[in-house]
Amino acid sequence: MDYLPVEVIGNILSRLGGARDVVIASATCRKWREACRKHLQTLSFNSADWPFYRDLTTNRLEILITQTIFQTMGLQGLSIMMDDANKFSAATVIAWLMYTRDTLRRLSYNVRTTPNVNILEICGRQKLEALVLAHNSITGVEPSFQRFPCLKSLSLSYVSISALDLNLLLSACPMIESLELVSLEIAMSDAQVTIELSSPTLKSVYFDGISLDKFILEADSIEFLHMKDCVLELFELIGNGTLKHFKLDDVSVIHLDIMETSESLEVVDVNHFTMVWPKFYQMISRSQKLKKLRLWDVVFDDDDEIIDVESIAAGFSHLTHLSLSYDLKDGAAHYSLQGTTQLENVTVLELGWTVINDVFSIWVEELLRRCPNLKKLIIYGVVSETKTQGDCQILATFTWSIVQLMRKYIHVEVQFEYE
């Protein structure tokens, strides 16, 4: 270790990340202290990583963080993620940010202060490339002054902000490619909460825990969109057909429109979602490149509605991975049994049930027949703890049917996942 250049030692310390580990390691010898002072690139203070932080008074914690930060030169990554047990002095926190802002590329900030610290004002017009902001408040955004010319990634979690300020903040980031919005507290200006965001450079967007009346996103370069635990009346995506990956996870939306951007879709992943199948199919049908389609635990507005596998087979000829799980009602033998178009390129098939019945084995058999080049079949099932004699009989019949079926498809690998 004595022969390692201080620059290499600095890289080693930077990979440790956590301030406690960095301080302990840098105490090894003079050379390591020099590496920590001059060549440390990343430093992290996280109350979840080290319970000792919680045992310190706020003043002692401020001193510890201040001493550690001020012993460094040229930090590029700084993470200060503290729980709500401490409220720091705004002056102290501003001193940390002012000392490091000229060289910072990445900042993760979850610090409660009295009064509130305006991160945008302090870190704007600098070289920041990634900003993670949590449990904070943003007001009065001025794009001409609070500009982030190099910012590529922005994450806001549990942040209070108005719809106007959010749009202004996005416009102040001309290079932004990734946006994450988690459980925002949207300041309301009227009875209807509407957000309209526009960015020509956005490629990846993630929304979690967002509840609004209307959300309109205009993103000409978007490739990835993931929405989770959201409640919306209307969501509209406007773009140039660049969207490749679209994921919905436990989302409630009355009117969903991504049709304008769906031409390049390669992955559609929908989980716990209520849909009108004809409308949903029409929305994604423009894509001729779809490779993976996952419709899992979906519910229909109409009890008699089905997912039409014939339209999937005819419309998505490049599909290689198909996953389907929804309630197959007794007597509905027409589920997926109409039509003859095959899913020629599907090699992985995932099928699931929440309540098993006799229709399921028929459904599995028909889908196997539709996939002549299938390599892998995965069956997911929910088995209740309390089982009647009838439940056991249905499960036994299904198991026997699958055993018989797989004798015809010996080239297919079969997996069962029960919960």
Swiss-Prot record:
Repeat found in the keyword field: yes
One GO CC term on file: cytoplasm
Q: Which residues cross the membrane?
A: none
What keywords does the record list, in alphabetical order? Leucine-rich repeat, Repeat
Ranges for the LRR repeats: 53-82, 96-124, 133-157, 158-183, 185-209, 245-272, 273-297, 301-326, 356-381
Q: Where is the F-box domain?
A: 1-48
By its UniProt entry, which CDD domains does this protein fall under? F-box_SF
Q: Entry's SUPFAM superfamilies? A: F-box domain, RNI-like
What's the protein called, per UniProt? F-box/LRR-repeat protein At1g67190
